[in-house]
Amino acid sequence: MIIPCIDLMDGKVVQLIQGREKALEGGSPLEMLARFAAFPQIQVIDLDAALGKNLDNDSNDSLVELVASRCIARVGGGVRSPERARALIEQGAYRVIVGTAAFDREKLTGIANAVGRDRLIIALDSKGGKVVTHGWREATNFTAEEVIRHLEPYCSGFLCTYVDKEGMLEGTDLDWFRRLRAATSHELTAAGGITTIGEIKELHKLGIHAALGMAIYTGRLNLAELALLNA
């Protein structure tokens, strides 16, 4: 499955390079939903919340709710408490994505209990070979391949981002995704640098979904062609 991404920052749809440099702004969330109407699921990431900004009074909340109420949406960014996870479900999110909190056993258990493991996706973001957290700003000392099996009991799938190539339109690391596929039977979604139809087809052979951002916002990949692949 191909999953278009809507990333929100300061109330706008944006695309970043490696989670830091803003590369472009898209249309409004409703305009993006109209463009992505042929796709069964949309991924929504609140970048401000992921970076720890305005967690208690997030300016993007109304936009997240707007999108989630109009499509089947997986929503993430700054989900670090059971209350936040539950609120997103109540706003219309079909599934919730948890990153940083997945590495705090108490928080992860609380979130999984709050929304149910079937509605929980854990984000495993890799940079320089190691898992990174807190909006990709803090590195751990372990790899995604090492921890993925330990996290399986808490979720129904993983969103795995190859941060080294995120937003750079230079292709992703298919070998990394092959190793992840060998490490778990859980649902996997690949993100980070996916630029060609060939990469998407290779991921499909592995049984891995593709979350796409920069490649579709820049027109590198054609939405009509992607929709046919998704059919």
What are the functions of these language-model segments?
Residues 8-22, 93-166:
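Conserved anion-binding
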Residues 35-37, 89-90, 151-152, 204:
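Non-catalytic positions within long, well-ordered alpha-helices that form the structural scaffold/packing
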Residues 41-59, 100, 160-169:
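Glycine-rich, proline-tolerant flexible connector loops at the mouths of alpha/beta enzymes
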Residues 55-64, 137-146, 170-179:
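Charged helix-capping and loop-helix junction motifs
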Residues 63, 69-95, 175-210, 226:
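Catalytic cores of alpha/beta
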